């Protein structure tokens, strides 16, 4: 009986350990001087900055639409959405095409795509408070990779219209 109890304890410990060892890949992007991570499972494509068609009577952060392989996609400036200065378009500027369940595909403008990193549960700290404000409301966790902090974006907050 004692052996069975010990085995059950080990099983629970193993389950907790597996959860913390599960790894997720993130694309690290730069906005201004800050680094953010986007879960790679939500990324459909990364394309160079291109000409957009403006749409009238929409929030300022909705920069327009692009035609990508016959699909018309809205493009959001997450700099404006998050309260940064307007986008400065450079050779490093990219549009990341996100594939989201509710909204479908949507593009977000980022200053630079830096790298892909793999983070385990041990390297990610969830933000547990509900009353997030400012730029923090657009992140849901912080990851640590090679001694650097990466704010992990909450894509639902980025794409919600009410949070302009």
Question: Across the structure, where does each feature detected by a protein language model lie?
Answer:
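An acidic, low-aromatic, low-complexity terminal/linker signal
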Residues: 1-164
């Amino acid at each position: 009986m004692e052996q069975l109890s010990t085995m059950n304890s080990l099983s629970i410990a193993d389950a907790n350990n597996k959860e913390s060892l599960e790894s997720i890949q993130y694309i690290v992007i730069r906005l201004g001087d800050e680094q953010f991570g986007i879960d790679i499972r939500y990324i459909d494509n990364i394309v160079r900055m291109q000409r957009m068609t403006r749409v009238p009577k929409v929030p300022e952060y909705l920069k327009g639409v692009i035609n990508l392989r016959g699909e018309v996609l809205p493009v959001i400036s997450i700099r404006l959405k998050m309260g940064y200065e307007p986008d400065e378009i450079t050779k490093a500027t990219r549009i990341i095409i996100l594939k989201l369940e509710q909204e479908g595909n949507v593009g977000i403008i980022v200053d630079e795509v830096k790298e892909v990193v793999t983070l385990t549960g041990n390297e990610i700290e969830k933000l547990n408070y509900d009353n997030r404000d400012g730029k923090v409301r657009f992140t849901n966790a912080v990851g640590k990779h090679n001694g650097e902090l990466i704010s992990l974006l909450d894509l639902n907050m980025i794409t919600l219209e009410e949070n302009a």
